[in-house]
């Protein structure tokens, strides 16, 4: 995602920048993941660069497998200010540990796949002895 160059952007612009549908952006707002944003004279949502940066972080948490319930909890703590720094650090540390375990698990899976691919390539490269039916 890129930073907003003007003061505010619409929900459609944020959707295009982030790849998140307007419906999902409204859902995140209703769930407290995104804070309620200001509205223009026309009643449309107006997102500021800070909102874009926060959404980018939320999407990173989501991409790394943090459940929405935990993201919501983190957003609630964030909204309470600096007095919640330690609980936020703890949440992120726990999530980082889970992520490291998942990375290790996926790395092991990738090694198994690599071994299987190597075995198949050896079989493909090895000349096959003709069978009796093929010789006839």
Describe these PLM feature segments.
Residues 1-73:
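Basic helix-turn-helix/winged-helix DNA-binding cores
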Residues 30-31, 44, 55, 77, ...:
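Generic secondary-structure boundary signal with a strong preference for alpha-helix termini
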Residues 72-82:
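Short, charged, low-complexity amphipathic alpha-helix
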Residues 59-62, 78, 95:
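Alpha-helix boundary/capping residues
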Residues 1-6, 80-136:
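C-terminal regulatory/oligomerization modules of transcriptional regulators
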């Amino acid at each position: 995602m890129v930073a907003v160059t003007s003061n505010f952007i619409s929900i459609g612009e944020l959707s295009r920048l982030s790849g998140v549908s307007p419906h999902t952006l409204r859902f995140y707002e209703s769930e407290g993941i995104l804070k309620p944003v200001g509205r223009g004279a026309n009643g449309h949502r107006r997102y500021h660069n800070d909102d874009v940066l926060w959404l980018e972080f939320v999407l990173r948490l989501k991409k790394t497998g943090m459940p929405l319930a935990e993201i919501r909890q983190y957003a609630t703590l964030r909204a309470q200010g600096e007095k919640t720094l330690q609980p936020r650090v703890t949440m992120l540390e726990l999530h980082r540990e889970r992520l490291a375990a998942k990375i290790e698990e996926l790395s092991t899976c990738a090694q198994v796949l690599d071994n299987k691919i190597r075995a198949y390539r050896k079989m493909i490269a090895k000349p096959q002895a003709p069978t009796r039916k093929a010789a006839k």
